[in-house]
Amino acid sequence: MKVNLGNCFCLSLSQKKFPLPLASLLVNVPLALMVALGMNLALERPGVTGEMVVLESPIAPEAIFAQGVKAGEAGNYAEAVELFSVVLNLSPDSPETHYNRGLAWERLGNVDQAIADYGRSIALDRYYIPPYINRGNLYSQQQDHHTAIQDFTQAITYDPNRYKAYYNRANSYFQLGQYAQAIADYNRVLVLRPDYINAIYNRGLAHFQAGQLDSSRQDLLFSAQAYLNRGDRRSYLEALDQMSELGL
């Protein structure tokens, strides 16, 4: 079965104002000044570590946030965690920053920290969809599909056009043996994204488990040809192998 879909790093902060004037906020020089003010300071530099100064630039949090996104997208997840933590020192009520730090934690394999940050993001803005989907994926990886379904369903409630939530919920229904619900969700995915081949492939597997062999054969054969048309030979061969294993 093709795996769940996640979300990428959020690229910008919301327009919410920071709770305090930046001139009154203290942050750590080695990280914040290096990023926000462009000073080339190392954390281990004598006389610098632990020194506290005032950042007076009104764009500093946005600049640090942008550097965190850049670090995360480059795969430097530990650095991204540090940068987003600095932003949260300035604005602890930023759902996007908690989400991004959660994603960095997730990429580092720190699932508990990731789930905690996704939870904080949701608590700050219950209508912000990405943390529901990513947290649901983590629950799914832990085989806690019932809790995962709750997160995916909440995402769908707030945004009925979020195809990733339907797709991931379908996968959890599949893992629970609830094949009719899985097929229904794959159908919804294909209404929103008719070209999403993985949903057709997974629906074919669900049809097979539900005893609907003709529909299963049709979906798997269609997905195999679609993969080939896109130049994805590996997925093409996988679909053919799956049909052979299932006797289709």
Curated annotation (Swiss-Prot):
Kindly give the InterPro entries that the UniProt entry links to this protein: TPR-like_helical_dom_sf, TPR_rpt, Ycf3
Could you give a single Gene Ontology term from the biological process aspect? receptor-mediated virion attachment to host cell
* Keywords of this entry: Repeat, TPR repeat
Q: Which GO terms describe its cellular component?
A: cell outer membrane
Q: Which Gene3D superfamilies match?
A: Tetratricopeptide repeat domain (1.25.40.10)
Domain of life where this protein originates = Bacteria
Residues in TPR repeats = 61-94, 95-128, 129-162, 163-196
- The protein depicted here goes by the name TPR repeat-containing protein slr0751
Species per Swiss-Prot/TrEMBL record = Synechocystis sp. (strain ATCC 27184 / PCC 6803 / Kazusa)
